[in-house]
Amino acid sequence: MQVICDPGGFPLWVSDVRPGSTHDLTAARELVLPALYPYAARGLPVLADKGYTGAGIGVHVPVKHYPYGPLHTDNRCYNFLITALRAPAERGHALLGRWRALDRVTVSPHRIGAIVAAALVLTSLDRGSR
């Protein structure tokens, strides 16, 4: 499942669920990135984790650490900043995950997508009531 969050960490959109063997980047290329590229082309950054390395221009991911030595100080600072900026998006995942209907879901993947979409609606309604 792919989630798009606003800069404050509130979930705005959730994708349909893909089989567990589908890599994050493959699902993102199919479901999310085509919608985000126009914004990235206008300079709006898209932040992602290391699973999205190679996603394309405008998608910022941390620099991977390789076994041949420590990361350069610049790369470590870059990783720290990207991770800190991504923290609100992780909050968005937590907001969706708080609904008990999503605990230990064992139904078909097609139904999981509908349950997650309902959780997004409930999260939006809950936000409006505060």
What are the language-model segments listed below?
Residues 1-130:
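Short, well-ordered secondary-structure "scaffold" segments embedded in the functional core
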